Amino acid sequence: MTKTDRVCVGAIAGAFGVKGEVRLKSFCTEPTDIASYGPLSTEKGDRSFRVTLTRPVAGGLGARLSDVTTKEEADALRGVGLYVDRARLPSLGDDEFYHADLIGLEVRDTGGALLGRVHAVHNHGAGDILEVAGAAGREGLLLPFTRAVVPTVDLAAGRIVADPPEGLD
């Protein structure tokens, strides 16, 4: 299975309490869906966990992970990404994309000039933002992932066409 066959759906933010519960940050559109995708695995695939959500907590969800029973075990998992096989995820609608599919795409402006490549996708509550690592001689930039700024995403061609707002290009 290649990395593109798996999608990161969340991360462990740290221990919650003293009995092995964790604070889970879900990257799913509906945060609680993370528990419905079956066992989640680490990036390397060397560990997998069944997830049982316990309650909402500040910055995420409280959860129990199979085989994690102590605070120390939960603390050791801080920062670990949780992945699922792409086949277990729901189908996407038109103009919807998994963040993993956007990372690495070439970004060009509407005139064809290379701006760089998508390095990361962030969401701080107001919508997705593409972090573009600049092409040679160009600074990186942050682009709001809206139809106005990113009119074209062509996964098959591996490219994005962007129309950066005045002052960002």
From Swiss-Prot:
Its main location: cytoplasm. Residues 94-168 form the PRC barrel domain. The keyword Chaperone applies. It is found in: Cytoplasm. GO terms for molecular function: ribosome binding. The keyword Amino-acid biosynthesis does not apply. Binds ribosomal protein uS19. This is Ribosome maturation factor RimM.
